[in-house]
């Protein structure tokens, strides 16, 4: 089996996790108490969904997941929520004291007390797997727990499970909407370790997803539940090929191979189509070509950056539902002829496609319409650098005055770590610049940079 373990860290990670597991359960027909009436092989079996769920002797399906937070309120919602019977109580780990939006607390003082417990739980899950494929890590980098404890866990996972791939779904601070003053610090410090310790990171941004909800779903005031349900569709599409049998299956390690040209350039944009409300879907027939085009629209990107300002290095298109390879090839051929969608000149093919025959499932009472086919795109584009330069600029403004730095130093960090992380990100921006440059020009001035 090719199992995946999901690790949900901090409030954002846990709430996205709730939406994902709710959706997985609906997709597989697993009830909130873990029973699965449709499963013929009780107590084991090699069904495709066993990559995400382990099965007890009594036929109960338990998610291969760990939820961690440094304070109890968010995890208590899981403990008392609809799906409380789904999880083993040991999978829900909460501390007593918050990271207080402080990377250093999450990474050093408070985080290090809980990290060994988390690793024990993860080890138990890993021992339960026959062929662990990798980890899916969900967190946000603006707060304290997601950034600090998230980085710490990733560093420790690299030590304990060196070769296993780690896929991150990371919520980055938005350009306008901010939830905390020290977001830029936490993000820069956290990205520093994401660079080292994740193999692929999919960037999400609340503002971009708000706009999609407002524009495409006509929700005037989107809540986090609306956002998370949209994000969970993306994550479900990515993992569908692990959980169902399809025509063109895509493995987690395959994402890595196809999307990451250089180890540091592994930050991806994601988009999903069709995002459409039930009232509209009734009147529209969405062909493969249409949903493919709409996945490439700058407004469908789930992070605030404009792919028209950069070049694509690689794209992964995951279709699900009533889709045949012939239509996909035609749609991709059309995309390649478009002038607005530019690829770097050293990567002529640039597309990886996956097809899964399981049509997209929607949460009853949710916002998305039930459709016959959908596509999720994960793309590696040089325009992602916009996200980093935005955060770096805000970081510089604050750090020039050393504002708020004493909170971090007081928790055992050194100022050197700030400048080290900032330099690493400056190098990352430069890497993106060089990757997007025309390769013919690049040959004369190679010598100066190194």
UniProtKB/Swiss-Prot annotation:
Keyword entries, A-Z: Acetylation, Cytoplasm, Cytoskeleton, GTP-binding, Hydrolase, Magnesium, Metal-binding, Microtubule, Nucleotide-binding
N6-acetyllysine: residues carrying this PTM: 40
Any one GO BP annotation for this protein: microtubule-based process
Signal peptide coordinates: none
EC number, UniProt record: 3.6.5.-
Main location: cytoplasm
Intracellular or extracellular location(s): Cytoplasm, Cytoskeleton
Catalytic activity: GTP + H2O = GDP + phosphate + H(+)
Processing and modification events after translation: Undergoes a tyrosination/detyrosination cycle, the cyclic removal and re-addition of a C-terminal tyrosine residue by the enzymes tubulin tyrosine carboxypeptidase (TTCP) and tubulin tyrosine ligase (TTL), respectively.
Residue numbers marked as site, Involved in polymerization: 450
GO molecular function: GTP binding; hydrolase activity; metal ion binding; structural constituent of cytoskeleton
One cellular component term from this protein's GO annotations in UniProt: cytoplasm
SUPFAM superfamilies in the cross-refs: Tubulin C-terminal domain-like, Tubulin nucleotide-binding domain-like
Quaternary structure and interacting proteins, as annotated: Dimer of alpha and beta chains. A typical microtubule is a hollow water-filled tube with an outer diameter of 25 nm and an inner diameter of 15 nM. Alpha-beta heterodimers associate head-to-tail to form protofilaments running lengthwise along the microtubule wall with the beta-tubulin subunit facing the microtubule plus end conferring a structural polarity. Microtubules usually have 13 protofilaments but different protofilament numbers can be found in some organisms and specialized cells.
Function per UniProt: Tubulin is the major constituent of microtubules, a cylinder consisting of laterally associated linear protofilaments composed of alpha- and beta-tubulin heterodimers. Microtubules grow by the addition of GTP-tubulin dimers to the microtubule end, where a stabilizing cap forms. Below the cap, tubulin dimers are in GDP-bound state, owing to GTPase activity of alpha-tubulin.
Family, similarity comment: Belongs to the tubulin family.
Designated name of the protein: Tubulin alpha chain
Top-level taxonomy: Eukaryota, Viridiplantae, Streptophyta, Embryophyta, Tracheophyta
């Amino acid at each position: 089996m090719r199992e995946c373990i999901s690790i949900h860290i901090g409030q954002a990670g846990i709430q996205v996790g709730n939406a994902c597991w709710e959706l997985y359960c609906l997709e597989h027909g697993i009830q909130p108490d873990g029973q699965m009436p449709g499963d013929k092989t009780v107590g084991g079996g090699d069904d495709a969904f066993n990559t995400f769920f382990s099965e007890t002797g009594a036929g109960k399906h338990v998610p291969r997941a760990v939820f961690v937070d440094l304070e109890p309120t968010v995890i208590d919602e899981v403990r008392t929520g609809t799906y409380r019977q789904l999880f083993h109580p040991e999978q829900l780990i909460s501390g007593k004291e918050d990271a207080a939006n402080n990377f250093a607390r999450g990474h050093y003082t408070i985080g290090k007390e809980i990290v060994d417990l988390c690793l024990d739980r993860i080890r138990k899950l890993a021992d339960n797997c026959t062929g662990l494929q990798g980890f899916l890590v969900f967190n946000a980098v603006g707060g304290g727990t997601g950034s600090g404890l998230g980085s710490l866990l990733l560093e420790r996972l690299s030590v304990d499970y060196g070769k296993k791939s780690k896929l991150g779904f990371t919520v980055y601070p938005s350009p306008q909407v901010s939830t905390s003053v020290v977001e830029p610090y936490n993000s820069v410090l956290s990205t520093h370790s994401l660079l080292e310790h994740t193999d692929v990171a999919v960037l999400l941004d609340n503002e971009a997803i708000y706009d999609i909800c407002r524009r495409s779903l006509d929700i005037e005031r989107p809540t986090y539940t609306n956002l998370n349900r949209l994000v969970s569709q993306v994550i479900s599409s990515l993992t569908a090929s692990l959980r169902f049998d399809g025509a063109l299956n895509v493995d987690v390690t395959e994402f890595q191979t196809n999307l990451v040209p250089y180890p540091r350039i592994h930050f991806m944009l994601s988009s999903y189509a069709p995002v459409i409300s039930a009232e509209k879907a009734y009147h529209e027939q969405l062909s493969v070509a249409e949903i493919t085009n709409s996945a490439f629209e700058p407004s469908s990107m789930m992070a605030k950056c404009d792919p028209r300002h950069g070049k694509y290095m690689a794209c992964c298109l995951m279709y699900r539902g009533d889709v045949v390879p012939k239509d996909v090839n035609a749609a991709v051929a059309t995309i390649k002829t478009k002038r607005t969608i530019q690829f770097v000149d050293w990567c002529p093919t640039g597309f990886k496609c996956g097809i899964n025959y399981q049509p997209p499932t929607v949460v009853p009472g949710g916002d998305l319409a039930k459709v016959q086919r959908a596509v999720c795109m994960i793309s590696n584009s040089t325009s992602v650098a916009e996200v980093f330069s935005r955060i770096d600029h805000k970081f510089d403004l604050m750090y020039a005055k050393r504002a708020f730095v004493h909170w971090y130093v007081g928790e055992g960090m050194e100022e050197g770590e700030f400048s080290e992380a900032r330099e690493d990100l400056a190098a990352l921006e430069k890497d993106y610049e060089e990757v997007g440059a025309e390769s013919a020009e690049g040959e004369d001035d190679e010598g100066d940079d190194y």
